[in-house]
Amino acid sequence: MVMRAIDRAVKDLLSTETGGGGGATMPVEKLARTQALFLFQIIRLLDGDVTLRAQGERDIRLLEVWLNDLCKVRENLRDLGAGSGTSERNSVGRRNQHPPQWETWIFAESVRRTIIMAHSFLQLYEMMKGLGSGSSNSSEAEDDDRGVWDYTHRWTLSRHLWEAKSSFEFERAWKEKPHFIITNYAFNHFLQNGRGDDVDELAEILLSVYMGVEETKEFITAKS
């Protein structure tokens, strides 16, 4: 029953893109469809059921295409320097700027976070399958990984901004709390200057990938 429900939901999602309506055109629609397919992919690829996994692997390429579409509408914080040496200055500088509209920032950050989380998941899945570590497809897999991570994917590490419940809370956190612009998995500056209280759920997941689960817990506890 669960398998049928998932299969039907995915088919409904894909039919909206291939039907006569022309598919998603607005940025919010592109974000919604990508997040929906991403969640279905997590279920199908990690469930352990052979049929679900085969269906999920069939749609990996489609998820990548939709992620590329999201990259085209993403505000990638290009005004900030990518090097870690400029991160502290940029954080202070941004706090001195007038904060963006709360709803606008939430949408833009959702796009940025969806992109880096989905790409990270797809790479992790390939690693779990053994690609890139001696299999016959290792060269192709490594080329794909370089293609994804050759691009700069920036996102904002700040629990205070991400968990703000109102425009007032957001503006106050923007002015009073540090927020760190992370490029891909470049956490060095944050680990030197950030605090455990800055870490939200996504940041904890990505930090765990970067430095290990226990090390991340220790950092959050020690620097809170």
Where do the model's predicted regions map?
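C-terminal transcriptional activation/regulatory domains of eukaryotic transcription factors
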Residues: 1-48
